[in-house]
């Protein structure tokens, strides 16, 4: 069941869904708009090979921003201004606001799992022309869906509690894989 604006306001009022800071104008008909936060990570163009088993943060440049230009076809990680907390029976779909999609910007399909807490880091792919983005601009739209029952294992993954832009974390996955297959 997708939560409409009345449901969302009720869940927010009861504290079942937490969004901080929450602005009233961001609660929409069937979701909540989240805003561009104050930090991005640009992907560094290189011929070096990225190895997920030995991640190197030198592939990214983290910048504190009030505004930034996403260049044509550039890939950028950005964080939301808001910190969210979801209960064990609510998940969210992350969508780019249509005004930005109509400019040619793109984000990959992204889900926020039930039980997640943190700021959302999202990948944005640039358009065919440069686009200026400012901190505080409503940028992504979360559509919340209630599960039929609380999930058995709420999200407790490597991105739980993240604040600011968070780079990809692969080492844990590689370590888990190796530990499972070396027995």
From Swiss-Prot:
Q: Which GO MF terms does the UniProt record name?
A: dCTP deaminase activity; nucleotide binding
Recorded superkingdom? Archaea
List the active site: 123
The record's catalysed reaction(s) read: dCTP + H2O + H(+) = dUTP + NH4(+)
Which Enzyme Commission number(s) are listed? Answer: 3.5.4.13
Q: Which GO terms describe its biological process?
A: dUMP biosynthetic process; dUTP biosynthetic process
Top enzyme class, one word, equals: hydrolase
Q: In which pathway does it act?
A: Pyrimidine metabolism; dUMP biosynthesis; dUMP from dCTP (dUTP route): step 1/2
Q: Which UniProt keywords apply?
A: Hydrolase, Nucleotide metabolism, Nucleotide-binding
Where dCTP binds, per the record, is at 97-102, 113, 155, 162
Which InterPro entries does the protein's record reference? dCTP_deaminase (IPR011962), dUTPase-like_sf (IPR036157), dUTPase_trimeric (IPR033704)
Assembly description = Homotrimer.
Similarity-based family: Belongs to the dCTP deaminase family.
Biological role stated in the UniProt entry: Catalyzes the deamination of dCTP to dUTP.
What is the name attached to this protein's record?
dCTP deaminase
Q: Its gene?
A: dcd
């Amino acid at each position: 069941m997708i939560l409409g604006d009345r449901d969302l306001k009720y869940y927010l009022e009861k504290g079942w869904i937490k969004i901080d800071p929450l602005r009233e104008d961001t609660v929409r008909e069937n979701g909540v708009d989240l805003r561009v936060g104050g930090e991005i990570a640009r992907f560094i163009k290189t011929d070096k090979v990225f190895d997920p088993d030995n991640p190197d943060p030198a592939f990214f440049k983290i910048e504190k921003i009030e505004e930034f230009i996403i260049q044509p076809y550039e890939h950028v990680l950005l964080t939301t201004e808001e910190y969210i907390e979801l209960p064990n029976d609510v998940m969210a779909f992350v969508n780019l606001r249509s005004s930005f999609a109509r400019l040619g910007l793109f984000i990959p399909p992204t889900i926020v799992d039930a039980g997640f807490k943190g700021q959302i880091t999202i990948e944005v792919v640039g358009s065919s022309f440069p686009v200026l983005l400012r901190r505080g601009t409503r940028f992504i739209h979360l559509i919340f869906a209630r599960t039929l029952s609380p999930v058995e294992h709420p999200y407790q993954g490597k991105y739980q509690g993240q604040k600011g832009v968070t780079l990809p974390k692969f080492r844990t996955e590689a370590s888990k894989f190796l530990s499972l297959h070396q027995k």
